[in-house]
Amino acid sequence: MSATHVWRAVLISLLLSPGLIAQSGGAASSTTQCNLDDGRQVYMRYNAVSAKNEKLSNGKPWTPGGSPMTLFTEAQLTLGSSMIPIGAYTVYPIPARDHWTLAVNKNVTPGAGYDEKQDLARAPMETAQVAQPSDTLEVAFAHVGARCTLRIYIGKTASFAEFTAK
C-alpha cells in the first residue's frame, strides 16, 4: 500500500470521527476539501455554528463553537512565506476590524488552548463585507492550479487566505 493510500485512510478516519461524535449529541462538524490537480487533497474540518451565537473579538483567535478548525493536508503547502508540511494542524482565524489574520498551529491536542508559540504559519487574510449575510459559518476552498483559497463567511464578513501546494 502506498504512502498516499495510508494518508488518505488516516484522513478519512479522522474526518469521520467528528460525524460520529455529532450523531451522539456533540457539536455539529462540517468538512470542506480542495482537490489538487495531482490528486492530493487538502481538508478543513470546522463547527458550522450560527452567526448569531458566535462572539468574535478583535485580535483574539476565534474557535467556532469552542473548537479550532482543523486542517489536514496531503501536500506540502505555503501560507504567506511559511511552509506547512504534510499532516494535521489547528487553524485559528483572528478577526480585526478591517482585516483578519489566519494562524496555522502545530498543537492538535484536543481541548488545548491556543498558544501563539506553536504557530507554524501566519498570514493576513483579505477581508470584505458582503451584501447578503450568512446565517451560519461557511468555510469553502476555491481551487485554481496549485492553489487552494480558503474562504470563510460569517455574518456579513468574508475573509480569504491562499494556500499553495508544493
Model-based region annotation:
Residues 1-6:
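N-terminal secretory signal peptides that target proteins for export/translocation
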Residues 8-19:
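Bacterial N-terminal signal peptides
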Residues 23-30:
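Cleaved targeting-peptide boundary
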Residues 10-11, 27, 69:
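Generic detector of short alpha-helix boundary/capping microenvironments
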Residues 37-86, 92-166:
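Extended, well-structured beta-strand/loop surface patches
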